[in-house]
């Protein structure tokens, strides 16, 4: 009889749980993971790309990292088709705010508006929730650099370091151990790579399996969102000694 | 006419692998001058500019809407809009308001992928008019036509183009009571954007 409280998202189970929402979170647990780390001079986002088949044409643009506005970017874990809908609404929200007030949208307000949308799908109509967790990295004049994590229930919180997707608990606990409050952006990148080597299934990291993005301020105080090219990513991997020299494959 | 309420002069010219776009700087309320540093030309991205003549309030609102739409395009497509595409966007946005239009006449100038300059103008409901040489709009448009007709030569280099567009603008606004008070000129080449402020008859 456990099906009784499963079929509709809007119904609480007798134990006070929303099963569909929990299943949505479960779906994210199988997706490629993403890690975000806040440092004193920027925010680092790193994502693991799941290579499903070598026959699949890899897309030219980033698969897990999306720019929302000039000052906000996000990393995605979960169902990509669901994520695309939310990313689109987030971009429109950010532009609407700029149109209305002629200044960039505060990061938390943007995250909140998106989480309101997510929450709506856990309460109304016989629809399923969005199977997506986000990590938002951004900068605004109110609170400087910020990192937020959101889940399918519409919960969000500000973090110094956070992980979503496969093995997020293991990643979270390593982050808890090794995170330093006064870390620089470079150190944050190193920590993110280190965590990912430990939590990913494959033993060696390569640039094809990774995506690395940073949000920081340029010397002229404008916010810059930068996604690393595979070449610069390979250089970083070698520099931090987390990649093995290319193994011979027959 | 409400198009003549604030007064304006906007002109764009094509050169050899470059273009220039210029406007006056006056914001008036009929014959009284309110400001002498009004911006009618805006950058959409490094290779596309738009100048909006007509009612100042609609100039600003229309520009903000265009930025909105262009930004979403940039994010989705991960590239800048081509000038031709942008002109079609402006035209579509204007025609949306067919029966209560934005009271402006845009001038669009840009460089395409192969560094080929593109200029065009349209009326307040988005009917495009493409040109190979120059386009004009605003209360001084009639005198601008004359000045450009007389001064324009094809395939000018950036510096000569600057001189020509500036002379055309300054001599035209002197024949118009509602525009003038100096000028704002942009010269755009594939490698750089030059922005210059002109002094003319400041009265």
Swiss-Prot record, chain A:
Keyword Cytoplasm: yes
Principal cellular location given in the protein's record: cytoplasm
Claim: ATP-binding is one of the keywords in the record: no
Subcellular location: Cytoplasm; Nucleus
Keywords carried by this UniProt record: Cytoplasm, Isopeptide bond, Nucleus, Proteasome, Ubl conjugation
Pfam families linked: Proteasome (PF00227), Proteasome_A_N (PF10584)
GO biological process, one term: ubiquitin-dependent protein catabolic process
Disulfide bonds: none
Gene Ontology annotations for the cellular component aspect, listed alphabetically: cytosol; cytosolic ribosome; mitochondrion; nucleus; proteasome complex; proteasome core complex, alpha-subunit complex; vacuole
Classification via InterPro entries: Ntn_hydrolases_N, Proteasome_alpha, Proteasome_alpha-type, Proteasome_asu_N, Proteasome_sua/b
Sites of the Glycyl lysine isopeptide (Lys-Gly) (interchain with G-Cter in ubiquitin) crosslink: 40, 64
Signal sequence region: none
UniProt function note: The proteasome is a multicatalytic proteinase complex which is characterized by its ability to cleave peptides with Arg, Phe, Tyr, Leu, and Glu adjacent to the leaving group at neutral or slightly basic pH. The proteasome has an ATP-dependent proteolytic activity.
PANTHER family from the UniProt entry: PROTEASOME SUBUNIT ALPHA/BETA (PTHR11599)
NCBIfam families reported for this sequence: PRK03996.1 (NF003075)
Similarity remark: Belongs to the peptidase T1A family.
Name by which UniProt lists this protein: Proteasome subunit alpha type-4-A
């Amino acid at each position: 009889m456990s099906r009784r409280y499963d079929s509709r998202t809007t119904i609480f189970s007798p134990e006070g749980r929303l099963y569909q929402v929990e299943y949505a979170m479960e779906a994210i647990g199988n997706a490629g993971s993403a890690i975000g780390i806040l440092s004193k001079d920027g925010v680092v986002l790193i994502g693991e790309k799941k290579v499903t088949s070598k026959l699949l044409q890899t897309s030219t643009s980033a698969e897990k990292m999306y720019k929302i506005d000039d000052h906000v970017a996000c990393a995605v874990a979960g169902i990509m088709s669901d994520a695309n809908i939310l990313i689109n609404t987030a971009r429109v929200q950010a532009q609407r705010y700029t149109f209305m007030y002629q200044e960039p949208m505060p990061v938390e307000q943007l995250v909140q508006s998106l989480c309101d949308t997510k929450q709506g799908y856990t309460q109304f109509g016989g629809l399923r929730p969005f199977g997506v967790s986000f990590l938002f990295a951004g900068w605004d004049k109110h609170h400087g650099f910020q990192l937020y994590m959101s889940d399918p229930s519409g919960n969000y919180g500000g973090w110094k370091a956070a992980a979503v997707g496969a093995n997020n608990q293991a990643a979270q606990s390593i982050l808890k151990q090794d995170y330093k409050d006064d870390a620089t952006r470079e150190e944050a990148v190193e920590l993110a790579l280190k965590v990912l080597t430990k939590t990913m299934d494959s033993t060696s990291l390569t640039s094809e399996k990774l995506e690395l993005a940073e949000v920081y301020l340029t010397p002229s105080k404008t916010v810059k969102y930068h996604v690393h090219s595979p070449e610069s990513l390979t250089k970083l991997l070698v520099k931090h000694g987390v990649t093995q020299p290319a193994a011979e494959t027959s | 006419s409400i198009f003549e309420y604030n007064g304006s002069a906007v002109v764009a010219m094509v050169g050899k692998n470059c273009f220039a776009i210029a406007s006056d700087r006056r914001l008036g309320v009929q014959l009284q001058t309110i400001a002498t540093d009004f911006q009618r030309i805006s950058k959409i991205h490094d290779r596309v500019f738009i100048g909006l003549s007509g009612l100042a309030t609609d100039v600003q609102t229309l520009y903000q809407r265009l930025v909105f739409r262009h930004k979403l395009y940039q994010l989705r497509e991960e590239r800048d809009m081509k000038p031709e595409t942008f002109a079609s966007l402006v035209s579509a946005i204007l025609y949306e308001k067919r029966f209560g239009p934005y009271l402006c006449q845009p001038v669009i100038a840009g460089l395409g992928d192969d560094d080929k300059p593109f200029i065009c103008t349209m009326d307040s409901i988005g009917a495009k008019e493409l040109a190979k040489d120059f386009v004009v709009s605003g209360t001084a448009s009639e005198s601008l036509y004359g000045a450009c007709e007389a001064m324009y030569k094809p395939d000018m280099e950036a510096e000569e183009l600057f001189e020509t567009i500036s002379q055309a603008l300054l001599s035209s606004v002197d024949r118009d009571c509602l525009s003038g008070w100096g000028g704002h000129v942009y010269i755009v080449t594939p490698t750089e954007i030059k922005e210059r402020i002109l002094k003319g008859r400041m009265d």
